Amino acid sequence: MEGPGLGSQCRNHSHGPHPPGFGRYGICAHENKELANAREALPLIEDSSNCDIVKATQYGIFERCKELVEAGYDVRQPDKENVSLLHWAAINNRLDLVKFYISKGAVVDQLGGDLNSTPLHWAIRQGHLPMVILLLQHGADPTLIDGEGFSSIHLAVLFQHMPIIAYLISKGQSVNMTDVNGQTPLMLSAHKVIGPEPTGFLLKFNPSLNVVDKIHQNTPLHWAVAAGNVNAVDKLLEAGSSLDIQNVKGETPLDMALQNKNQLIIHMLKTEAKMRANQKFRLWRWLQKCELFLLLMLSVITMWAIGYILDFNSDSWLLKGCLLVTLFFLTSLFPRFLVGYKNLVYLPTAFLLSSVFWIFMTWFILFFPDLAGAPFYFSFIFSIVAFLYFFYKTWATDPGFTKASEEEKKVNIITLAETGSLDFRTFCTSCLIRKPLRSLHCHVCNCCVARYDQHCLWTGRCIGFGNHHYYIFFLFFLSMVCGWIIYGSFIYLSSHCATTFKEDGLWTYLNQIVACSPWVLYILMLATFHFSWSTFLLLNQLFQIAFLGLTSHERISLQKQSKHMKQTLSLRKTPYNLGFMQNLADFFQCGCFGLVKPCVVDWTSQYTMVFHPAREKVLRSV
C-alpha cells in the first residue's frame, strides 16, 4: 500500500527494521518520527525457523529465505498486497537476497503495490544507492514509470537523493526526461521541493531551462514562482531562465508572481529583467568589462580625497567631519549601481592597492628628499617592486582549481558509486568531481581548490597548492614596504614638525603632529594597519608551514574537532608534519645542499595516501 508516500506503505506492511527515508516530496519530518517509533516497537525475531518468507525477507534472514525457496516457493509470487519478494528485499536494502532471488528467476522490473512500482522505484524512494546500483546491473529499467507517472529520476529528485540523481544521469538517463504530465525533473524540483536543492544540483547537469510541460505549458521558472520557491527562483535566474515565455494562460513568471503577491520574487524578477535590458546597451557592457578598473580608480580617488580633507587648511574639525560624511555617502553610491555583486568582493583588494599607491607617492614626494642617500632608498624600491610582483603572481596563478570534462565527471561518479565512495567526503556535489586529498570547495570561487588554505580577502583569490608560496612572499614584502614607510614617517615628522613632547606630554605632542602634517599622519595610520595584519598573517603562516605542516583550513578544522573530543588533539602530531626542515623543503620545493630533499606531490590529482620516502610516513587527509 504505497498510498501518498512510502511511509504509510512501510507502516502497513511492517517490513522490518530499516531506517525510513523521506516521505513524498521530501517533506515528512512528522511521519519520519512516527516511523522511527513504529520501528522501535517492532518485535525482534528470536526464532526465525517459523517465520514466513515475507518477514524473513524484511529482516534479511538469508538462510530462512533460501530454505523456503528451495522448498518450492515461487520468488515471483506476490503477497496479498501485490508486493513481490524483490520489492521487500529492495526497500530494506537486502543486497544478498536480491542477488539470490534474481538467480532464482525473480523479475527485476516486476510491478507491485498500489502504485504499480518496480523494486527500483522502492529502492530509490528510500535512498538505497547500493541497491539501485545492483538492480541496474541486473537489467532494471530506470525509464519505467510508476502509478503516479514518475520515472526513477523523478523519484530521486522528489525525495532529494542527490547521489542517486548523479548516478542515474551518469548511467545515461536523460536529465530532461518527462513524466506523464510532461514535467522534467527540474520542474518537479522547482515546484515540489522548497529550497536550493536539488534544483541547484540538477542545474549542474545542464538541463533545459525553457522547456514547458504538456498541460500548463509552464517552464521550471513558472513552477518555482507558483510554489513561492525563492531559492529555486534565484538558482534559475542565475542559470539564465527566460523571463518572457508565456504559459497556456498567457502568463509570464512575473505575471504569476504579481498574482501571488510574493513581493520578494517580484523584486527578484524585476531586478533581473532590468539587468538583462541593460545588457543591450554598449555603454553598460563596457562598464561591466571595466568594473574592476573603475572600482580601483574610485578607491584611489576616495583615499586621496580623505587625505585632502584631513590636510585641508582649516581648524574646524566639524567642517572636515561633514565633508568626510558627504564623501563616504557619494562614494557608496557608485558600487551599488555600477559594480556587480560578484565584483564587490574585490573592494578590500582595491583598498590595499590604493593604499600602496598613495604610500609610494608620499615616499616619492615627501620622504625622498630626506632619505635619498640612505639605504632606505634602494630597500624601499626593491620591496615595493617585489610586493607588486608577488601580488600579481598570487592573483594570477591558478591556486589549484580541480577541473574535469563532462565525461570524466560521469566516469568518476559511476566509479565512486559502485565502490561505495559517493559521499561528501570524496565527492563534491558542486563541481561533480572526486575531491583530491586536502582540497576544499570555495564558495566564492565556486570551485574545489587543491591543498586549500583560505580565500584571501586582500588578494580576492583562493590560496592553494598553486600559489601558496607566492602568497607568503606577498605578505613578507608588504610588511617590508609598510615597515619602511612607518620608519620614513617618523623621520619626516621629527625633522619637519616642531614638538614639545618632553615639556608638554603626549597629548600636546599628538596635537602638534596632527597640526603639522595630517596627510603624513594619515599615511602612517594606513601603513600601520597594513603592517599589523600582514605581519600577523605572515608569522601565522610560517608557524603553520614549518612547525605543523598544515594549511589554515586544516588547522582550524582540527581545532574545531578537538573541542568535541575527550582527549586534546595535538596539532603537531599529524601525518603532514615531517619536521621543520622537511616541511619547509616540501612547501617551497627546494633542497638544502643535499641535506633535505623535497617530496614532489601534485595535490590537484592526489586521491590516495602518499608514501613519503624521507620519513617513511603515510600522509592522510585531515
From Swiss-Prot:
Keywords: Acetylation, Acyltransferase, ANK repeat, Cytoplasmic vesicle, Golgi apparatus, Lipoprotein, Membrane, Palmitate, Repeat, Transferase, Transmembrane, Transmembrane helix. Residues 313-320, 369-370, 492-518 are lumenal. Belongs to the DHHC palmitoyltransferase family. AKR/ZDHHC17 subfamily. The DHHC domain is required for palmitoyltransferase activity. The active site is at C456. GO terms for molecular function: magnesium ion transmembrane transporter activity; palmitoyltransferase activity; protein-cysteine S-palmitoyltransferase activity. The modification N-acetylmethionine is found at M1. It holds the Pfam family DHHC. The chain crosses the membrane at residues 292-312, 321-341, 348-368, 371-391, 471-491, 519-539. Residues 1-291, 342-347, 392-470, 540-622 are cytoplasmic. Residues 426-476 form the DHHC domain. Its main location: Golgi. This is Palmitoyltransferase ZDHHC13. The keyword Acetylation applies. Interacts (via ANK repeats) with CLIP3. Interacts (via ANK repeats) with DNAJC5 (via C-terminus). Interacts (via ANK repeats) with HTT. Interacts (via ANK repeats) with MAP6. Interacts (via ANK repeats) with SNAP23. Interacts (via ANK repeats) with SNAP25. May interact (via ANK repeats) with SPRED2. One of its GO terms (cellular component) is membrane. It is a multi-pass membrane protein. The gene is ZDHHC13. Palmitoyltransferase that could catalyze the addition of palmitate onto various protein substrates. Palmitoyltransferase for HTT and GAD2. May play a role in Mg(2+) transport. It comes from the Eukaryota. GO terms for biological process: positive regulation of canonical NF-kappaB signal transduction. SMART domains: ANK. It is found in: Golgi apparatus membrane; Cytoplasmic vesicle membrane. ANK repeats lie at residues 43-78, 81-110, 115-144, 148-177, 181-211, 216-245, 249-277. It catalyses: L-cysteinyl-[protein] + hexadecanoyl-CoA = S-hexadecanoyl-L-cysteinyl-[protein] + CoA. Its EC number is 2.3.1.225.
